[in-house]
A protein has these predicted regions:
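Beta-strand-rich interaction surfaces with strong enrichment in secreted/lumenal proteins
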Residues: 4, 16-18, 83-87
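Hydrophobic core residues within well-ordered beta-strands of beta-rich domains
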Residues: 13-15, 94, 109
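Catalytic strand-loop segment that frames the active site of acyl-thioester-processing enzymes
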Residues: 10-46
Length: 142
């Protein structure tokens, strides 16, 4: 399944191509670096994109939990960020996993995420995110 079908991002802002696996508390997505992306420079995508790649894997999980509906989410914090490689090359395919470790039942979640290219660890981090319900979104938007 195409990840873009349940993500709020579109076009060049999508950093998850395909949903590989999704279950209760877990998502796995594939992403290939595009040569024509405005974020690709000299044939590489820098490590600055890694947190967004991880966050979009969480976004895929959120969309799955909301019956395929793309929902707005907020990245609140990143802990234990470990980057093993400074960039990804054009056409490299990475696999991102997101495993939920905490949920408060009100829209606050913590996920342990990892990006791998084959057997190589690229990056990992613990992301705190908020997936607001409709009532909370209305109060945010005024």
């Amino acid at each position: 399944m195409r990840a873009s079908s349940i993500l709020p991002q579109s076009g060049y802002m999508v950093f998850a191509d395909e949903i590989l696996e999704i279950s209760d508390g877990y998502a796995s997505c594939a992403f290939s670096v595009k040569e024509d992306s405005p974020f690709t420079e000299n044939g590489e995508l820098g490590s600055y994109a890694y947190m967004e790649i991880m966050a979009q894997c969480i976004g895929v999980y959120s969309g799955y939990r909301n019956d395929g509906e793309a929902r707005l989410g907020f990245l609140l914090g990143v802990r234990n960020l470990d980057i093993s490689r400074a960039s990804l090359k054009v056409d490299e395919r990475v696999i991102t996993t997101a495993r939920q470790s905490v949920s408060d039942g009100e829209g606050l979640y913590i996920f342990d995420c990892e990006i791998r290219c084959g057997d190589e660890h690229i990056a990992s981090a613990t992301l705190s995110v908020m997936n607001p319900n409709d009532e909370m979104l209305k109060s945010i938007n005024g």
